[in-house]
Amino acid sequence: MKIAVYGKGGIGKSTTSCNISIALARRGKRVLQIGCDPKHDSTFTLTGFLIPTIIDTLQSKDYHYEDVWPEDVIYKGYGGVDCVEAGGPPAGAGCGGYVVGETVKLLKELNAFYEYDVILFDVLGDVVCGGFAAPLNYADYCIIITDNGFDALFAANRIAASVREKARTHPLRLAGLVGNRTSKRDLIDKYVEACPMPVLEVLPLIEDIRVSRVKGKTLFEMAESEPSLNYVCEFYLNIADQILSQPEGVVPKEVPDRELFSLLSDFYLNPSSSRSDMQLEDNSLDFVMV
């Protein structure tokens, strides 16, 4: 199974990806996480350091694939999760999609691409071009990381459009949204009402999730010395269980930009009416159930 994780830049994709990878490993799966970001820091919380990228390794070998060994590019992380960083082209030059393609090509050359139960692609920022949508070519499922904010959901809608486009030619489905570090989900629910898709989990607004990134540790590793964090790990284990159940997923139909802008901005500009509408719907549902 191959999973591509997308979301607005800075939303917490790498932190979430690392914890999902650990959760999958805790369920007995052999997991490879591939960071697809020029910053090459996707796997930092798994390994505790910035591992060399595949592009750097290939450059040092003059792109002689036969001179590259698995241990040159695959690093063992916490919990037995294997880690790879694709890296990226120089700033302002090249294509990130090419880098992803070279990474997959090398892993196939090393007979490593098909050795894992789950491969998770952690992809940078928003999908702004076909190049960075490249991991969707290999994925069975896409997961979108968001929060309860305007910008993150606007980005999620653009990613949903990319999933729909790729699903025309690939067996790709959207597994769902993951709300990261948010105390509310009303705007998420409003968006999902307009663009139907599953919400896999909404992670609590706790500082430890952000701090784990700075410490270079996953929540699972931190929980070994801070048992109070075990309840947070259950959220990631729940996501892993849903993924491993091989959900049907959806091919989303994104909301047109202007319509989405109006929908989300109205929620901010007229909060009282939006909340009263939602309360009215809840009351109606209760009445029907009685």
Swiss-Prot record:
It is found in: Plastid, Chloroplast. Pfam families: Fer4_NifH. Mg(2+) binds at S14. It catalyses: chlorophyllide a + oxidized 2[4Fe-4S]-[ferredoxin] + 2 ADP + 2 phosphate = protochlorophyllide a + reduced 2[4Fe-4S]-[ferredoxin] + 2 ATP + 2 H2O. It is an enzyme of class 1 (oxidoreductase). GO terms for cellular component: chloroplast. Its main location: plastid. Its cofactor is [4Fe-4S] cluster. [4Fe-4S] cluster binds at C95, C129. Keywords: 4Fe-4S, ATP-binding, Chlorophyll biosynthesis, Chloroplast, Iron, Iron-sulfur, Magnesium, Metal-binding, Nucleotide-binding, Oxidoreductase, Photosynthesis, Plastid. GO terms for biological process: light-independent chlorophyll biosynthetic process; photosynthesis, dark reaction. GO terms for molecular function: 4 iron, 4 sulfur cluster binding; ATP binding; metal ion binding; oxidoreductase activity, acting on iron-sulfur proteins as donors; oxidoreductase activity, acting on the CH-CH group of donors, iron-sulfur protein as acceptor. ATP binds at G10, I11, G12, K13, S14, T15, K39, N180, R181. Binds 1 [4Fe-4S] cluster per dimer. Its EC number is 1.3.7.7. Pathway: Porphyrin-containing compound metabolism; chlorophyll biosynthesis (light-independent). NCBIfam families: DPOR_bchL. Component of the dark-operative protochlorophyllide reductase (DPOR) that uses Mg-ATP and reduced ferredoxin to reduce ring D of protochlorophyllide (Pchlide) to form chlorophyllide a (Chlide). This reaction is light-independent. The L component serves as a unique electron donor to the NB-component of the complex, and binds Mg-ATP. Homodimer. Protochlorophyllide reductase is composed of three subunits; ChlL, ChlN and ChlB. PANTHER family: LIGHT-INDEPENDENT PROTOCHLOROPHYLLIDE REDUCTASE IRON-SULFUR ATP-BINDING PROTEIN. Belongs to the NifH/BchL/ChlL family. This is Light-independent protochlorophyllide reductase iron-sulfur ATP-binding protein. The lineage of its organism: Eukaryota, Viridiplantae, Streptophyta, Zygnematophyceae, Zygnematophycidae.
